[in-house]
Amino acid sequence: MKKKWLVAISGIVLTFGLAACSKTVATTSGGKITESEYYSSMKKTSSGKQVLQQMILNKVLEKEYGSKVSDKKVNEQYNTYKKQYGSSFDSVLAQNDMTKSSFKQEIRSNLLLKEAVKDNTKITNKQLKAQWKEYEPKVTVAHILVSKKSTAEDIINKLKEDGSYANFKKLAKKYSTDSSTKNDGGKLAAFDNTDTSLDSTFKKAAFGLKQGSFTTEPVKTEYGYHVIYSIKNPGKGKMSDHTSELKSQIIDSKMSDSTTLQTVVSKVLKKGNVSIKDKDLQNILSSYLGSSSSSK
């Protein structure tokens, strides 16, 4: 399962003491390594510069938007990811060199940046109408996955005799090859049009079902043949009832647009009155500010 990490930060907090008697970071038979030596080495690396860039951005974002990002919001998103990955959550963090604490900080950084994008985005009615065409409400479905089309057709025929959800769950447990959902009657987590994990053909079929109905033809994807049952589908309704959701989806799409993020970050940093005191690092924000941030 691919993970789209929220913000390109390492999750490392670096604190350097530059006093004359610099603290020792490590000792070896060949001598000691001091914080100032470590700093001098790290600041020359791309990863070291990237960490400083992110630390500066986080400081500025916290001052401007910190009050808009509560611990509750951070924990809600954290728990969503934790639930998504289940028992593999800890190993996913480890594979990405992250701790639970640093991941929460990454989530917070992303939410702060999102607030900045909101603040610097004027959503037009034309954009809302365009997003409405793509919009689908959050639906909940169950599916039965099999390898042969004929098996899927046999299952559909059984459902035509008894199309209840109870019968569907029995059939899922008996026939489905999806081991992660079959014991729960094939039930999947709710999703809407912004979902990127499911096959587009599968989603189109699911969105087209009325609540309590099932697909009368097998739905083919790269995984095999699906029979889909709609557990919950509130219907699309009217655009005026979903303005808030549409705006949120537009902002989310801008969070994936590098040009938008470049523009927003540039505005935030310029407003933040950033001053780089180390002459060797004065150009690390030049791609955002257009010139070096010299010592003042």
Swiss-Prot record:
Catalysed reaction equations from the record: [protein]-peptidylproline (omega=180) = [protein]-peptidylproline (omega=0)
One Pfam family cited in the UniProt record for this chain: Rotamase
One Gene Ontology MF term: peptidyl-prolyl cis-trans isomerase activity
Role description: Plays a major role in protein secretion by helping the post-translocational extracellular folding of several secreted proteins.
PROSITE patterns, per the entry: PPIC_PPIASE_2, PROKAR_LIPOPROTEIN
GO biological process terms held by the UniProt record: protein folding
Signal peptide from the UniProt entry: 1-20
Protein name as annotated: Foldase protein PrsA
Lipidation positions, renumbered (N-palmitoyl cysteine): 21
Domain PpiC: 136-232
Enzyme Commission identifier(s): 5.2.1.8
Species of provenance: Ligilactobacillus salivarius (strain UCC118)
InterPro entries per UniProt: Foldase_PrsA, PPIase_dom_sf, PPIase_PpiC, PrsA_foldase, Trigger_fact/SurA_dom_sf
